Amino acid sequence: MNLSLRRSTSALLASSLLLTIGHGATLPFMTIYLSRQYSLSVDLIGYAMTIALTIGVVFSLGFGILADKFDKKRYMLLAITAFASGFIAIPLVNNVTLVVLFFALINCAYSVFATVLKAWFADNLSSTSKTKIFSINYTMLNIGWTIGPPLGTLLVMQSINLPFWLAAICSA
């Protein structure tokens, strides 16, 4: 693997880890956030989360199909920008509908990034490197989901908005 490809691969693996830490720090606390900030009942929170996650999945399917038609690096940068923008916007808006839409955007961006990242690895890595890099990426995802929720717990005890700011910083 040449130096440029090695650097790109390392940067993408680090991005995968950081985005997952940010997502893991916020996803478990969305119910608390919606309850505290907007006094939503449990059933309304369930509907809001279901809508946000469903929108994210449906749109990510379409964007995943488009991934092969466009420059993957640019597509990943767009996903990271959308991810960061969503996490910056959630604590700043004062409207539950916008929060749900931004959360849908975040989930879509996370799914798109993950899909396009795998496609980039498949397109650019040699067959001998693919197995190793895919394995490392899954390890990064597991580490991110292991670190994110406890870190989110520590932050939410200080301020309900801190996990969102962490997620935005992680994606920068």
Segments and roles (model prediction):
Residues 163-172:
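Symmetry-related core transmembrane helices of the 12-TM Major Facilitator Superfamily/SLC fold
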Residues 91-103:
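Helix-loop junctions at membrane interfaces in 12-TM secondary transporters
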Residues 147-163:
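Transmembrane alpha-helix termini and helix-breaking/packing motifs in multi-pass membrane transporters
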Residues 74-89:
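Structural signature of the two symmetry-related core transmembrane helices
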Residues 53-61, 145-146:
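Residue-level signature of mid-helix packing/kink "hotspots" within the transmembrane helices
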Residues 59-71, 156:
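Helix-to-loop junctions at the C-terminal end of transmembrane segments
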Residues 3-53:
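Helix-loop boundary and gating motifs at the non-cytosolic
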Residues 104-141:
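Cytoplasmic helix-loop-helix junction between adjacent transmembrane helices
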